[in-house]
């Protein structure tokens, strides 16, 4: 049995476009849409159910936009303020129609919204995606183009729409088969809003994969869209028994028949408005998947009503995986903002500090004005209060995972740190008010433990008696850190050193100079002061070496010229001939290299060369048989080797190799 079109009580027929009509206009999809349509039809067939989620979500957004616009002009409701979404199935025409009485579109809107992707960087992002990522159903929603998911199951899509507040004869019909073009023509549409009709492909209109099964559609709505605050309705079915003659012993047969009554098939209440004690974990997970288009369940979440000077509800999620665009300029971040349950905007980045840009969720404020703009969000004291509250809540959630005795929660924190640890470190320099909270979450490998599990608190608990500082070393990777010449003295004395191998570490440590009143010391910067861990005999020997090596040190300064800021006898080397050291507050070679790669101007900075007086290569410099030319070559080689060991790059690798070869041939 066919259903009536939920908009105009007209039967939904197959599309017959009069291509000779002078009002019919044909348009070509922009390149990004064509690429996306190809992706939809060829890669996402295994996730065909998602079209229900996407089209219901779009309908909900359209109603949210109308509600928002109507706060300034309630005539837009056109005497129909009961917002709703309806889904109609027509078995004869093999169609499904999704209808809303939301904001609607005019011709220009339809061409822009359905024919282009209004997001910068989309094409580049699509080009970068690997084949495995293209199988992920969350891709579609990430671009805000969920409408196109209809082409997974439909060979043709028709859209009939009219913008709220415009006359009936300003309706628009948009039609496409998804192969590269679409047509637009004017129609008369008495009701505002949008009706999207999917003409199902044969494989999706019969058999087990059929979407003409109303029960299946209801299940998908319950799975993906139960939280939608608007009523989602379908025609009610009732059991009707066949008539039997009075007195007959034959049992009555019957069938399900459609009525003219529409029934709501979802809970129709915003999840975050309900008490947390009433919400099942599965409901939280389904809601997360719906608003983020992430196929994975979230790692953790927190749901709270905040009372005080500013009242708001927060429902915040930590994803399981970092998005591929986490570090790109086009990366979309921020929360959905509602004011008194009225949707205001997506991606309200002002509600979170940048280092928490991976957090997803919803904020519903009772105090912000309904006409709040992004500009106003940047200036509002209330928004700052909400942002600070969100940051504290997320950091508290992470701390509860990190400090839990429960192995599952510990594993969740390990997962989180592997995905988002580097982003959290940005907060050390960006959020001074929460710096201590953030520092407690940081984890590192050390010179005695390769696993990235040691916190500053753990390190302090293992410090040697008499140790006055938390020692750390930055490097490009763990292998480079473990083999760094700067570690040699610490290994000899059994002093543990934290090994930092992320590019953001050195930047972050510029802001974190102590932890729990214990200073942090980079062992590759400045002089090494082991304090009580260095005995008097060692100090006396070091002072003696300074005197005996002075002639060689002076010659090295001359040979190296402008390459080195200074040359000194080292107290930190045991096995290596030399190492490079920078002063406190100066940039390391790795940091300089990173900044140059980012195209930034880097201030001139020269390292100090420290030499090991006990190493045979350094002793060779003292040889009276050494010519001035060979001394200079050996000095340059020693400096270059120290630079390489420190993770730097040679300005002239060929010259380095030539000098090494010449010395080897002597």
Swiss-Prot record:
Localization of this protein: Cytoplasm
S-S bonds: none
Keyword Chaperone: yes
GO MF, one example: unfolded protein binding
Span list, region C: 594-666
Location of region: B: 375-593
Parts forming coiled coils: none
Region (A) residue spans: 1-374
UniProt keyword Nucleotide-binding, yes or no: yes
Entry-linked InterPro entries: HATPase_C_sf (IPR036890), HSP90_C (IPR037196), Hsp90_fam (IPR001404), Hsp90_N (IPR020575), Ribosomal_Su5_D2-typ_SF (IPR020568)
GO cellular component terms given for this protein: cytoplasm
Keywords: ATP-binding, Chaperone, Cytoplasm, Nucleotide-binding, Stress response
Similarity annotation: Belongs to the heat shock protein 90 family.
Subunit structure: Homodimer.
Function of the molecule: Molecular chaperone. Has ATPase activity.
Protein name: Chaperone protein HtpG
